[in-house]
């Protein structure tokens, strides 16, 4: 990795606006470490016609400092296909970078840390899916985007936490195989008459939250609004005021403007949402995703300057995996028109 860049007057001047925006969530002592990378990365992006896609779980200095496109998995998949950049850097985990490559196969797609994995994606293999299809012949397979390219290639249609119910019901069938998140499967099952055949995958971040924890927080903050992610256990969802995708959670806070809110998800999202909602108090007994936290500014800089950690996927896998993603996006477009 490159040595620490220097915090010069030029760097300070050119990043002052960014710091003013995020100073409530980034300690002043840390800024001289972040700013030089932000400055250099933004310069390099222009020179190389590169774009940085960042998931909502990225830290504020990445999210507001260098990202060109921010959002949930669905947003990033759609934007990866639309970008005119020559290079895509995914400030997210490995399956997100794979999805970007699937949607833009002719672009160079890089990830700052090749080992930024995902407990959900690692919970199932393509062979597991093939076995399930043999066990349940003719039953459509709906796969959460938090999966590898090889798993997507065995899938009929993908979904995200934002559109799982719509995708399942769009198939017009009585039952589906829904992979790999068991909690998201249970959440979808509560909202549809379609029989859900689930897998046992779990997100290591959301699985740690408990209803007891939420109940104790309500005692401490009687007016607390609890907003959870569908990857949480069912009793956590039942104890919440609202459940939705990361983008849905962000929109809920923006619209409702609660006095006190607890986002039952990865820690950095609370920091990012607070920047845009300064009058709301964010309660933070949250959990860190060790995989997302592998994405750091120095790694983004090294990745961009050296064009390392390129995502390479066999063309036959890309072609097979692209179809279920396109079907998912089509469902979203159709529902937005109805």
Where in this protein do the model-derived segments appear?
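Active-site loop-to-helix "anion-binding N-cap" substructures in soluble metabolic enzymes
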Residues: 2-264, 269-338
């Amino acid at each position: 990795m490159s040595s620490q860049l220097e915090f010069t007057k030029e760097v300070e001047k050119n990043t002052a606006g960014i710091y003013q925006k995020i100073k409530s969530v980034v300690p002043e002592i840390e800024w001289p470490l972040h700013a030089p990378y932000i400055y250099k990365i933004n310069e390099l992006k222009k020179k190389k016609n590169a774009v940085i896609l960042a998931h909502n779980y990225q830290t504020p200095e990445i999210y507001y400092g260098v990202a060109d496109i921010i959002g949930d998995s669905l947003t990033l998949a759609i934007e990866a296909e639309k970008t005119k950049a020559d290079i895509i850097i995914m400030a997210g985990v490995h399956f997100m970078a794979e999805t970007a490559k699937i949607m833009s196969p002719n672009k160079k797609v890089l990830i700052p840390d090749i080992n930024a994995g995902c407990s959900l994606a690692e919970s199932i293999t393509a062979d597991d899916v093939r076995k399930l299809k043999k066990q349940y012949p003719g039953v459509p397979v709906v796969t959460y985007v938090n999966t590898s390219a090889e798993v997507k290639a065995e899938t009929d249609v993908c979904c995200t936490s934002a559109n799982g119910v719509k995708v399942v019901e769009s198939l017009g069938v009585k039952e589906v195989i829904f992979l790999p998140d068991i909690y998201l499967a249970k959440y979808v099952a509560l909202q549809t008459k379609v029989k859900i055949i689930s897998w046992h995958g779990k997100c290591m971040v959301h699985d740690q939250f408990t209803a007891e924890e939420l109940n104790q927080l309500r005692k401490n903050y009687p007016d607390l609004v609890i907003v959870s992610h569908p990857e949480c256990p069912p009793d956590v969802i039942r104890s919440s005021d609202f459940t939705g995708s990361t983008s849905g959670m962000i929109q809920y806070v923006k619209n409702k403007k609660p006095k006190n809110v607890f986002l039952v998800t990865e820690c950095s999202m609370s920091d990012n949402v607070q920047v845009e909602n300064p009058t709301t108090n964010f309660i933070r007994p949250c959990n860190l995703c060790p995989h997302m936290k592998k994405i750091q500014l120095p790694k983004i800089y090294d990745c961009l300057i050296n064009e390392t950690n390129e995502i390479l996927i066999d063309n036959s896998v890309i072609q097979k995996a692209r179809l279920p993603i396109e079907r998912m996006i089509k469902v979203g477009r159709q529902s937005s028109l109805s």
